[in-house]
């Protein structure tokens, strides 16, 4: 995935500077448990919003830095740098026949996202309990290390 590759790039020191944006991350293990609980405990025709924990790229870099014992993120750039990356993202996709790493839609999503996804119903009815995002990041680092993708 594009995010998986960015994760690897950060861990390998290829993204020393970042724009300080983030997302609400849900560990797939927690999502699967909640999906099973939905089948068993969920109410018919009820929708459940399942959130995790918000963390930005600087926070991800800090967790990885502790895990890998090296400083990964050296600084942040202003948000407008994301817009400046659009032409190079397009050209890289064109020349290397890979998906674009940034689009105007992905930038819009980051700008207008809700950083707090409460998941109240999922927690109350489906026993949704998102694990700490640090645990997810550390487990993901180990996963990629075992495959030789993080050195």
Give the positions of each predicted feature:
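Short coil/turn segments at secondary-structure boundaries
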Residues: 22-23, 99-104
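Internal helix-turn-beta structural module
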Residues: 114-118, 122, 127-132
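Mid/C-terminal beta-alpha module of Rossmann-like enzyme folds, strongest
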Residues: 34-101, 124-125, 132-151
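Active-site loop of classical SDR/Rossmann-like NAD(P)-dependent oxidoreductases
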Residues: 57, 102-118
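C-terminal helical subdomain
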Residues: 20-23, 28, 32-36, 40
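NAD(P)-dependent short-chain dehydrogenase/reductase
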Residues: 1-24
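Short aromatic/basic micro-patch
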Residues: 25, 54, 116
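Conserved short-loop catalytic and cofactor-binding motifs
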Residues: 19-22, 48, 110, 124
